[in-house]
Amino acid sequence: MKNLIIRHARQVVLVCKNGERILKGEALKNIAILEGSVNRGISVVADEFGKIECIGYDDDVEPQYNQCSFASEIDATGMCVLPGLIDGHTHPVWVGDRVHEFAMKLAGASYMDVHKAGGGINFTVEHVHKATEDELYEPLKQRLNRMLQCGTTLVEAKSGYGLNTENEMKMLKVIERAKKELPIEISSTFCGAHAIPRGSTAKQAADNIINEQIPTLVKAIKAGELDVENIDVFCEKGVFEVEETRVILQAGKDAGLAINFHGDELHPIKGAELGAELGARAISHLEEISEEGIKAMSKSSVIGVLLPTTAYILRLKPPPARAMIDAGVAIALGTDFNPNAYCLSMPLTMHLACCILRMSMTEALAGATINAAASLGRADTHGSLEVGKFADMVVINAERWEHLIYQIGGHDDIIQHVVKHGKVVFSKR
């Protein structure tokens, strides 16, 4: 028995059709789309292993499968099918309400003003330290399920509110539990260098991460207790500056983790250049990236993960997406979901990318699919609808795919089904 057949779709957005593992430059202008019509729809078949087995017009596909049974069937008449969305940057494990900080920001407080006043990351760290694993897991579960309903089928999830070995491991264990119990797929990131713990210096914090936290993490990975793929550092003036960032990231890389870090968010401190030098897989934020940083990224394979929600809520200068795209940098997108930017929706993030970062809709969709997959090292299996890739899909009740971005906050209404590995994991009632 096959897992699924989708029939009669008006449009199927493949994104890629020739096995591309990244889209940048001119390739972003013409993403692959299979167009149907009122009289000739499109079918997608997912095999028993959760992978795409066939995509084609109904009249070509039906004869091949008329003797087949399917665990699920979707009538997508008048609808569009897109790849499952991929969120390239989130901080979803936390407790402690920070809604009061929103009023501070609206009154003119900067990110660092809030941080210095005892809010921000340190506020959340205090609450995470007091919480049990169960107390962290329940809100994480709710958030991830809401992301799934917004069309996200793969999400990057960071630790980073522990800032010591015990609590960073606690957060990573909670993420590991979510991987096993929830349908959404997760790429785990160790972010012990998210802030400098109170009473510590940057050097002391870096030494602790390198000599205690990373070895403990490696031991847990080797024991099969954790599956962590990436290492992150908040590379920022007054937090972990370039030299501390360098040694932490190198230690993580030496331990087998992919480099995927915060860079050049608030100040231009050459984070992009550092990432290119170290062979980073991805660098996030980049609001203050320099021209030299753009050049360095364009010459390397490092992906820029842009977070329009951050510029929006903090009223920051947005990252120079157009200059980066024009220079040949591959751009992915993320919600940056965290207590400072409470956004769970990749459709809204794509909308903001278009309006604030001046990206086109095809650029935004590539950033939320194939390029986001590449930022997590999964472009071989995720991020486009091609035979042999995982059948992760979003079915929307619209005849054109652009409605997923165009309708501001409209994803709750138009997302009809979310499919993960060929299984329907969400359907609108």
From Swiss-Prot:
Q: Report the superkingdom from the record.
A: Eukaryota
Provide the cofactor list for this protein.
Zn(2+); Fe(3+)
* Listed EC numbers: 3.5.2.7
Which biological pathway?
A: Amino-acid degradation; L-histidine degradation into L-glutamate; N-formimidoyl-L-glutamate from L-histidine: step 3/3
One Gene Ontology term of the biological-process aspect is: L-histidine catabolic process to glutamate and formate
Q: Which InterPro entries does the record associate with it? A: Amidohydro-rel (IPR006680), HutI (IPR005920), Metal-dep_hydrolase_composite (IPR011059), Metal_Hydrolase (IPR032466)
Q: Which residues form a coiled coil?
A: none
Detail which positions bind Zn(2+): H262, D336
Which residues are N-formimidoyl-L-glutamate-binding?
Answer: Y161, N338
Query: Which molecular function GO terms apply here?
Result: imidazolonepropionase activity; metal ion binding
Q: Where does 4-imidazolone-5-propanoate bind?
A: Y161, H194, E265
The top EC class is hydrolase
Pfam families named among the record's database cross-references: Amidohydro_1
Q: Which GO terms describe its cellular component?
A: cytoplasm
Query: What is this enzyme's catalytic activity, as reactions?
Result: 4-imidazolone-5-propanoate + H2O = N-formimidoyl-L-glutamate
Sorted alphabetically, the keyword list is: Histidine metabolism, Hydrolase, Iron, Metal-binding, Zinc
Paste the cofactor note. Binds 1 zinc or iron ion per subunit.
Record: residues binding Fe(3+): H262, D336
Family classification: Belongs to the metallo-dependent hydrolases superfamily. HutI family.
Q: What is this protein called?
A: Probable imidazolonepropionase
Q: Which organism is it from?
A: Nematostella vectensis
Gene name as annotated: amdhd1
